[in-house]
Design a protein with these regions (language model features):
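N-terminal signal-anchor transmembrane helix
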Residues: 82-140, 146-164
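Non-catalytic terminal accessory segments
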Residues: 1-115
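Context-gated lysine
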Residues: 6, 39, 83-87, 128, ...
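Serine/threonine-rich low-complexity intrinsically disordered regions
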Residues: 2-3, 35, 56, 83-94, ...
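Soluble catalytic domains of enzymes that build or remodel membrane lipids, polysaccharides, and related
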Residues: 130-368
Length: 368
């Protein structure tokens, strides 16, 4: 109710007003001046379009939002350079043609980009005493299954991952969410369970996977856990799992998950008694605890959650506010600790992703 009253409804009203004035401005460029009843009719039409986009939450919704943001930015550009080519610019902007063209191109790119899954490779060198051939780890996160990808597309991606012959695969949270049906959840983990790797597939919970009071999940946390485990996937939740004697996986509970029966352990508590001579691979859905993990001896931190911003201009806002320790990619947090954040295999909410690639990550860890 808070979301509806405080955010959604006021936002929809503002967008409706903007779309109304956008339409009337475009008509004026073609010499059409509306009478009062015509203006009201235009406003009603804008309200219907915004309402449909709000309820449907599809590509049209994203196109509409891009239209509004781009139009405002182009208006600002026109004000800054109004003395040069003002007449031509006024027609391009006033008619809405340039705005509509740019919005359409950006959204179409985002749609195609969403379904073009890439492999992103990183190489990390460590001074820890690990085997000469090193380790290869696949990182997958933020599938939000059911929003975009379907069974055959996910299977194709998993077949590509299997072909990499890696040592382990980490599913780093938000593989499913509140919009995933129970049938989709079951199919999703059946497909992920088919991945072939030397030491197996490991699961780290995210903030969307499990249901909370008031959520709309069609499966319980118990059903989710049962399906993950029954498909041969190992859940690593607030524990240290030895992959080999020299290579340890530290799986952290999702930060802030209130459905967990106990407060999550601190990074220091997790690695208490663990040899710092071993390579410590921390896996945590949200990249928000770099300092804590680094202090506990993390050599590498793998995360998801951010989607790389997913859509312009949201990615710019996320970069400016810096609510995460790392928005996307690889960064050296300290001389001893590296953090890698994936933009995710798919997306959340809408099947449009124009700020970052759809990807799975392959990390090669080698001795110096």
């Amino acid at each position: 109710m808070f979301y509806l009253q405080k955010i959604l409804l006021p936002g929809a009203i503002l967008v409706t007003l903007y779309v109304t004035f956008f339409a009337m401005r475009a008509l004026r460029q073609f010499g059409l001046t509306l009478p009062t009843w015509g203006k009201w009719l235009t406003g009603l039409g804008a309200a219907v379009v915004v309402a449909l986009c709000t309820v449907n939450r599809g590509v049209g919704t994203i196109l509409l939002l891009h239209l509004v943001v781009l139009d405002a930015l182009l208006r600002l550009v026109g004000l800054l350079f109004r003395k040069k080519g003002a007449k031509v610019w006024g027609r391009l902007w006033g008619s809405g043609a340039l705005t509509l063209l740019l919005a359409t191109v950006i959204v179409l790119f985002g749609y195609v980009n969403m379904y073009t899954i890439r492999q992103t490779d990183y190489t990390l060198y460590t001074d820890k005493d690990i085997r000469e051939e090193g380790y290869r780890v696949v990182l997958v996160a933020d599938v939000h299954y059911g929003v975009s990808l379907r069974d055959e597309q996910l299977q194709a991606a998993c077949d590509r991952i299997s072909a990499e012959n890696t040592d382990m695969v980490i599913l780093c949270g938000d593989i499913v969410d509140e919009n995933t049906t129970k049938e989709q959840m079951e199919a999703c983990f059946r497909i992920f369970g088919s991945i072939q790797s030397r030491y197996g597939v490991f699961y780290i919970y995210g903030n969307h996977d499990r249901s909370l009071p008031g959520s709309t999940h069609s499966f319980t946390p118990e059903e989710l856990e049962e399906n993950i485990i029954s498909n041969g996937i190992t859940i690593v939740r607030d524990e240290v799992l030895p992959i080999t004697e020299e290579f340890l996986l530290v799986g952290r509970e999702d930060e802030g998950y209130s459905g967990f029966p106990n407060d999550r352990l601190s990074a220091a508590e997790l690695v208490e008694g663990v040899s710092q001579e071993s390579f410590l691979l921390f896996a945590e859905h949200k990249p928000v605890s770099y300092g804590e993990n680094a202090a506990a001896g993390a050599d590498l931190i793998l995360s998801g959650h951010t989607h790389g911003g997913q859509m312009w201009p949201i990615n710019l806002f996320m970069a400016i506010t810096a609510t995460n320790d790392n928005l996307y990619g690889s960064m050296a947090y300290t001389d001893a600790t590296t953090g890698i954040v994936t933009s995710g295999l798919a997306c959340w909410g809408f099947d449009v992703k124009n700020a970052a690639p759809s990807e799975y990550v392959v990390v090669t860890i080698l001795p110096e």
